[in-house]
Each structure stands twice: as structure tokens, then as C-alpha cells.
Amino acid sequence: MPNSRNKGAAFERLIATNMSEELGLNVKLKRILEQTREKHLPDLIFGDWYLECKRYASGKEPATAWWQQVVDASKDKGTPTLIYKFDRQPIKVRIPLHSINNNLLVDNSITCDLFFDDFIYLIKSLYPQHIEEYNRSAA
């Protein structure tokens, strides 16, 4: 049986690699290693997106506690983003609905789930400044 911590870290690295490649980042996103020792830190940060990555064998819907964990980590600093995957299921991303439409009330309890590729499209389409800022700061 695989070690769950190793499985989680491997998933975080996969997401960092995929996001870096898909968004055309000059420098690969790096895991926040302190998150293993300090509570209330996300796994990855990209622009205003505070990313928590969860990889589990069974299930269809993410646990409420997972969303609360990333909401707590991003409090007053950024947009909570839960990236999750269950075996034999596609990678999905839960974000606050207001991050798709800024005319909506800012309320992190109102969410939507996207496929990972759709999340990448969302960033490229609505938040290109995050890509530009990241590439500028990484240069």
C-alpha cells in the first residue's frame, strides 16, 4: 500500500508541473514545503490562487473539510482553490463562483467545480495578468 504522504506529494508535483507547462510559466511552480509543518499554508500559490491538492483512492465528492482547509489558508490573501482527484476519475478544481464572474457576491461558500483543463482555460482567459506577473517575478 502506497504511503499517503508520498502519494499526496507526488500529486502536488504533478499539478505544479502541469500548471507550469499549460500556462507557459518561465519557472516551474514549487511546492510550499513548510505546509507539512505549519497549519494554514496551501500546497502551492500561483498569483492570487491558493491551491490545495488532494489525491484519494475512493470517492466522488471532496470532503467539506478539504474546502475549509484551503479557505482558511487563503483567508484575506487570495482565492481558495481545491484541486482533487479520485482513482479512475478526472482531476477537478473547486473554486468560488465569484472568481468566474466578478458581478457575483464574494462568498467562498458558493462554489463550482471545473475540470482541470477548464481551470487552466479560466486562468488564461480571465487572469492572464497572473501569468505575466509570475513570469516577470521569476525572471
List each language-model region with its residue ranges:
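Catalytic phosphate/metal-binding cores of nucleic-acid and nucleotide-processing enzymes, i.e., regions
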Residues: 1-139
